[in-house]
Regions:
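PLP-dependent amino-acid enzyme catalytic core
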Residues: 1-498
Length: 498
């Protein structure tokens, strides 16, 4: 069965998987979605015997149908190798009555590594398949983790240049240090004076700017994206939910076919959308639990059916979720409309022009798969403290939001179905927030001293990703206002000169 990709807004052309990965965004501003969700059709008992790499092939080959077996297996082998510090790639850790799916064992100690380790290989393979002669300019907005993972993935990849925009005052010190010390002749990091939504909106505008596209083409470039708007980011994320379920079956924790709950700390909606797609493929998932921080636009949407971005933007200790315009929700909205691209485009236009939209009662019925809630900053801190106290297990603030929301779900439903919590970042990325929750005396210590202390109390070695940046020199120090982002891109790509 060939799976093709079409736009959520209906005006763009239907394309192959490789072309969707190259384009990133459809020309009508919509996101690429598969023409149908393929079924997994592999016995779970068989999946339970597979490695992560073998599972990845089983899942991804069903979505990326124009890649040959050799091409895809080659991409997978190059992605999931010794860059990860465990052979399991994404191990499960049982703690405090749940199973934490550790997605932070890659090069940059965040879940973004799971997809961004393979995206450069998918993209360069796709370029070859489609006889693309232009170099690819990767434009990425980051709320903290995507940036470093994308930089690490694309560093020194021939035929690419990657430009990452991040909110100068909206990421953790370690997140920023990881980005601004990035090596690679084709890597560029630019701070902006606005927030993540400003960066993401400007990146999307550049994708849809036909005049800019013509200038790029003349200079021998074309844009693509490493953000989760790219289907090449989303498909690899489905893999780890399938892998987690097969591990639970393999260990005898659940029987084949028995349902589990999945909790995902959510900002841009990509990670939980991957779990939703896994469920559509046939993975036995009961509830998809969407955990928000104080930027609770998604919780309000699940509660009321109205998505309203007209609110204050709050900086929290879980910065990767500090988002008011949740881009991947558009893919769910498209499914909820019954794949009515015209209706989806109308709702997205309402969001763009008026800052809000409301879904119909019929569409609301499709949200039955989801449970949404949020955690305050105090509740997030308490969750880190509580899991550590009960299980000697240290979690980062994003995972803590998920844990806190899971406790609320239990209180609301008394549903004790086996539950997997997506653990999206290493606590070492957020040492100050984590240590403030588990220890009293932290104020006088810098972030690296806190990392040493965290290692001491947790018994977990400091990851290489943190050790490497301790003394690394700053290589990127450009800061611009959000409206000046296109000019920065042109300068980097040598389309204009000083």
């Amino acid at each position: 069965m060939q799976v093709l990709y079409k736009s959520t807004r209906g005006k763009g052309e239907t394309v192959t998987a490789s072309m969707a990965i190259l384009k990133g965004l459809s020309e009508d501003g919509g996101l690429f979605v598969p023409t149908e969700i393929p079924k997994l059709n592999v016995p779970v008992e068989k999946l339970a015997q597979m490695t992560y790499q073998e599972t990845a092939y089983e899942v991804m080959s069903r979505f990326l149908t124009d890649f040959t077996e050799d091409e895809l297996k080659n991409c997978i082998a190059n992605a999931y190798d010794e860059k990860f510090d465990t052979k399991e790639i994404a191990p499960l850790h049982e703690a405090d009555g749940a199973y934490f799916l550790e997605l932070f064992h890659g090069a940059t100690i965040a879940f973004k590594d799971m997809a961004l380790s393979i995206l450069p290989h998918l993209m360069t393979t796709a370029a070859r398949k489609n006889h693309v002669s232009n170099d690819i300019g990767i434009l990425t907005a980051t709320s903290g983790d995507t940036g470093k993972a994308a930089l690490a993935g694309f560093a020194d990849v021939p035929g690419t240049k990657i430009i990452v925009f991040y909110p100068k005052h909206g990421v953790s010190p370690i997140q920023e240090k990881q980005m601004v010390t990035q090596k690679g002749d084709n890597t560029y990091v630019v701070g902006i004076t606005g927030n993540f939504d400003d960066a993401q909106t400007a990146v999307k505008k550049m994708f849809n700017d036909q005049a800019l596209a013509a200038e790029l083409n003349e200079a021998g470039f074309q844009f693509s994206s490493a953000n989760s708007i790219n289907i090449g980011r989303l498909v690899p994320q489905i893999v780890y939910y399938v892998y987690a379920y097969s591990r639970l079956v393999g260990k005898g924790t659940v029987k084949a076919g028995e349902k589990i709950n999945v909790v995902v700390p959510t900002g841009n909606f990509g990670n939980i959308l991957a779990a939703y797609y896994a469920k559509q493929m046939g993975l036995p998932i009961n509830k998809l639990i969407c955990a928000s921080n104080e930027n609770k636009v998604l919780f309000d949407f699940f509660s009321t059916g109205t998505y309203d971005r007209k609110r204050d933007f709050i900086l929290t200790t879980s910065p990767s979720m500090d988002i008011l315009i949740s881009s991947n929700l558009e893919r769910l909205i498209y499914r909820l409309t019954g794949e009515n691209a015209e209706k989806c485009a109308e709702l997205m236009q309402a969001l763009s022009e008026g800052g809000e939209y409301t879904i119909t009662e019929d569409m609301k019925k499709g949200l039955a798969d989801f449970y949404g809630n949020y955690c305050s900053e105090a509740e997030t801190k308490e969750a880190i403290h509580s899991v550590y106290k009960n299980s000697d297990y240290v979690i980062d603030p994003h995972t803590a939001v998920a844990d806190g929301v899971y406790r609320k779900y239990l209180a609301d439903t008394d549903d004790h179905t086996t539950t997997v919590i997506a653990s999206t970042a290493s606590p070492y990325k957020f040492t100050r927030s984590v240590m403030e929750a588990v220890e009293d005396e932290t104020e006088s210590m810098d972030d690296f001293a806190l990392a040493d202390k965290l290692s001491e109390i947790s018994g977990v070695k400091i990851p290489k990703a943190v050790e490497e940046i301790r003394t690394a020199p700053v290589l990127h120090d450009t800061v611009v206002d959000a409206p000046d982002m296109p000019a920065a891109v042109k300068k980097i790509l040598n389309i204009v000169r000083d």
